Swiss-Prot record:
This is Maintenance of telomere capping protein 1. It comes from the Eukaryota. One of its GO terms (cellular component) is cytoplasm. The gene is MTC1. Interacts with ribosomes. Involved in telomere capping. Residues 1-153, 321-341, 416-448 are annotated as: Disordered. It comes from Saccharomyces cerevisiae (strain ATCC 204508 / S288c) (Baker's yeast). Present with 2160 molecules/cell in log phase SD medium. Residues 125-141, 436-447 have a biased composition (Acidic residues). The keyword Oxidoreductase does not apply. Residues 77-87, 95-124, 321-336, 421-435 have a biased composition (Basic and acidic residues).
Length: 478
């Protein structure tokens, strides 16, 4: 309690010191506040020991001063019309206010002490926050990079120059390549001559022959016209026999020499392929060009045709060899390879001749038909094969076919041995026609050539197969 009283007294004295000096009876009254403060402090420390005159004087001065204040306050309240409290109450209020201020100051001092401890941490936080705010402001201030604008800037500055330089380099390289290719083309054309052409042909020959052990070149000699499947039938029959009975690869090439009876070789009329159909399917009629006479005479004619074709082939082959010798650009190794390859190529000539035996005079009533290759009124195919490479010759005759079949296929009048028989047959046919005129008018027209053409083709194909088999047997020496 003593401490609280002392603090209140000190507060009062401090307040009094802050007031201006008052006049007392025309004299300035100077209250010795410090002395009174010391007296009060001394009284608080030793209340019973210190009761001097200085303390009384100080108290009197204070009371006088308070009275003056009260008077002044009363005068002010009279003017304003407001009642004022007693000076003691005002002093107490002021003391309470001073206490509140002191408590606030104490709290503030404590807060300042705690705040001083927290100041460095708060400063660091504030600095970090300020830095973050500055960075955010910088990010907001810095604009986003526009890719189109950057590309346009690059193109306007250095990109166009780089692209133009690259374009110029590529154009120069393209022109250089073009000039070089043109020069190489000129050099290539200058290097090509007859020797290179012959070398290419020789290499092609090596390729064709090298893939197989032997090549059969079959040359057909005949007078048949509009026979579409002749080459196919011969090639298929030879391939059938050789592939099943001979080891190693053998290739077969078939060509036609045309009409050897004429002076020189004339090109054969173009025939349709096998896909076009069998005999007689073309617009033009099939022509066999039969030889009427003895079989021996027909064989002589077939051999003559064959020999003529061989001579023509030999002359053409000799001219080819002369051209190779004139080139004279083949080394010894190539010549030896050519000679070895030529031994693997075999040239075969096949002559095809249909021979018809003339029909003798006979009675019409006792007629009966005989189908045979040696019987009059029939024909057969005589096939003569000659291998000029291996020196092999064979003769094959087909089965007999009626001559009237040829007449149906060719669309001509039936051929007989004498004019008398022709007249007799005509009169006999006329009688039959008159008797059956009424019946034939209603009947449909029949084409017998459609019946017989397949049998002729099958018989000729069978003869080709027999000829191929005989050739293989002769090659094997059996």
């Amino acid at each position: 309690m003593s401490e609280n009283k002392n603090s209140e007294a000190e507060d009062v004295f401090e307040f009094l010191d802050s007031l201006p000096e008052a006049k007392n009876g025309g004299k300035m009254v100077n209250t010795d506040v410090k002395g009174s403060q010391e007296g009060v402090k001394g009284g608080s420390n030793s209340v019973a020991g210190k009761t001097g005159n200085d303390g009384k004087k100080g108290d009197d001065d204070i009371f006088e001063f308070l009275e003056e204040l009260e008077k002044s306050n009363l005068s002010l309240t009279d003017k304003k019309g407001v009642e004022k409290k007693a000076p003691s109450e005002s002093v107490n209020n002021k003391a309470q206010d001073e206490k509140v201020e002191e408590s606030k100051e104490n709290k503030n001092s404590e807060q300042d002490a705690h705040g001083k401890e927290k100041e460095p941490q708060q400063q660091e936080k504030e600095e970090e926050e300020e830095e973050e705010e500055e960075e955010e402001e910088e990010e907001e201030e810095t604009p986003l990079h526009d890719p189109i604008a950057s590309i346009s800037n690059w193109w306007s500055s250095s990109g166009s120059a780089k692209v133009s330089s690259i374009w110029n380099k590529t154009a120069e390289q393209a022109s250089q390549i073009k000039n070089r290719l043109a020069q190489e083309q000129l050099d290539l054309t200058s290097k090509i001559n007859t020797s290179t052409i012959t070398e290419i042909a020789r290499n092609l020959q090596k390729i064709v022959v090298g893939e197989t052990e032997e090549v059969l070149r079959i040359h057909l000699v005949h007078d048949l016209v509009n026979y579409p499947s002749l080459q196919y039938n011969i090639e298929s029959k030879f391939d059938q026999v050789l592939s099943s009975q001979v080891e190693g690869g053998i290739r077969i090439f078939v060509d036609e020499w045309g009409h050897p009876n004429n002076n020189g070789i004339t090109p054969v009329e173009k025939k349709p392929s096998v896909a076009d159909g069998e005999l007689g399917n073309s617009k033009k009629k099939l022509q066999f060009n039969l030889f009427d006479g003895k079989v021996t005479d027909g064989e002589k004619l077939a051999f003559a045709n064959l020999e003529n074709a061989v001579k023509l082939f030999n002359t053409a082959h000799e001219e080819y060899q002369k051209q190779q010798k004139e080139a004279d650009a083949t080394p010894d190794d190539d010549r030896s390879s050519i000679s070895s390859n030529s031994n693997k190529i075999s040239d075969l000539f096949i002559s095809i001749l249909p021979i018809a035996i003339p029909q003798k005079q006979k009675d019409a009533d006792g007629d009966f038909q005989v189908t045979d290759s040696n019987t009059p009124g029939n024909f057969n195919f005589t096939l003569v094969l000659k291998d000029i490479t291996n020196d092999i010759t064979t003769i094959t005759r087909s089965q007999g076919f009626p001559v009237k079949w040829v007449n149906w296929l060719e669309g001509s009048v039936e051929k007989t041995g004498s004019t008398a028989s022709e007249e007799r047959n005509k009169s006999y046919d006329q009688k039959k026609q008159k008797e059956s005129e009424d019946e034939d008018e209603d009947d449909e027209i029949i084409d017998p050539s459609e019946w017989v053409k397949e049998w002729i083709e099958d018989g000729l194909s069978l003869s080709f197969g027999v000829m191929a088999q005989n050739y293989v047997i002769d090659r094997m020496g059996l």
